[in-house]
Amino acid sequence: SEISRLGEKFDFLVGVCDSKMWLDKCNMLPLGHYKKMCAVSREHPLAKKERLEISDLYGEILMMVAEGDSSANDRIRADLKRDHPAIQIEDTPHFYDISVFNRCAETGNVLLTLECWKDIHPGLVTIPVDWEYSVPYGLLYSLTPPDDVKRFVLEIKSILKSRSPSFE
């Protein structure tokens, strides 16, 4: 994967990362969060809604990454299973590729996605949901970064800390 090539092929990637598999292979400097949303085909009855309530998902099949690699997704799954059993969950691979988005468009299922991916597929509409789930994004870099990468990361941390004293 490209993640394991950090430090060889390139110094940095910027991306969403809550993956235990990825974080075993790289460092991450968090820069912010993206909200978890739902995507549906343009023909789906929910596609016309400006915002979804969780109850709008009752009776739907929600496609989401399989359990075990993402604490954010695992938390959503646990909450839905416990509090909203009327939502059926279908596992997808841990990392979405175009086949996952195509499957959502073709099946009429609902896909758990991110606000930053709202325009990723022309056949899907991404809709905010009335919940507070999000996933961090940030600067991904090698577990053994060279000195110039370390200096850059320290400089970014310093800038972030000066703008937000609560930044760690």
Q: What is the predicted function of each stretch?
A:
Residues 22, 59-84:
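Secondary-structure junction motif
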Residues 23-29, 33-34, 98-147:
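Beta-alpha-beta core module
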Residues 24-36, 40-62, 150:
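Flexible hinge/capping segments at coil-to-helix
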Residues 18, 67, 116:
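Flexible loop residues that form catalytic
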Residues 55-59, 135-168:
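Extended ligand-binding regions for polar small-molecule ligands
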Residues 1-21:
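Central regulatory/effector-binding core of bacterial HTH transcription factors
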Residues 1, 65, 85-97:
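Short beta-strand-to-loop elements that line the ligand-binding cleft
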